[in-house]
């Protein structure tokens, strides 16, 4: 799937998306694995190095035959119907809560909604309130994440 749809322009979007995730993680004081900007610019994306070793990369100028499966055949698949209204939408909400701009993440929500002709964010039940963390301050959320101490509304 990634190997057939990936090109330098899409890799740039992925890298910028990752930068927004890193900014959000920093604001929330949580750690993330290290992914370098250059790691996105491979036919195997950042996952090539993760699964095949730190020196593994396939430049866009080279053909790579080692892809499995054909990927989805339409837009009604989990890469959109789950990743966007759950992952992207929650990151967008956390960005608003923490004052972190998420224009790339927000654009993913808008583009996916436009392609599917429905509002994926409005349809999503996955809000910070649904997770019962919307009311928490930064300090309370830290206590919950690090110590498991939940502060109810």
Regions picked out by a protein language model, each given a short descriptive name:
Residues 1:
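A conserved mid-domain beta-alpha-beta active-site/ligand-binding segment of alpha/beta enzyme cores
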Residues 4, 8-153:
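NAD(P)-dependent Rossmann-like dehydrogenase/reductase catalytic/cofactor-binding core
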């Amino acid at each position: 799937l990634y190997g057939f749809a990936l090109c330098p322009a899409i890799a740039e979007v992925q890298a910028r998306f990752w930068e927004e995730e890193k900014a959000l993680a920093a604001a929330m004081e949580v750690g993330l694995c290290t992914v370098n900007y250059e790691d996105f610019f491979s036919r195997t994306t950042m996952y090539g190095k993760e699964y095949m070793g730190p020196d593994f990369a396939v430049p866009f100028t080279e053909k790579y035959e080692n892809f499995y499966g054909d990927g989805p055949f339409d837009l009604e698949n989990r890469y959109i119907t789950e990743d966007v209204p759950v992952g992207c939408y929650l990151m967008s909400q956390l960005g608003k809560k923490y004052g972190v701009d998420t224009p790339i993440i927000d654009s993913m929500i808008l583009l996916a909604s436009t392609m599917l002709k429905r509002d994926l964010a409005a349809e999503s039940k996955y809000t910070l309130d649904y997770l019962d963390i919307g009311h928490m301050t930064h300090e309370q959320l830290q206590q919950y994440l690090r110590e498991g101490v939940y502060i109810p509304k």
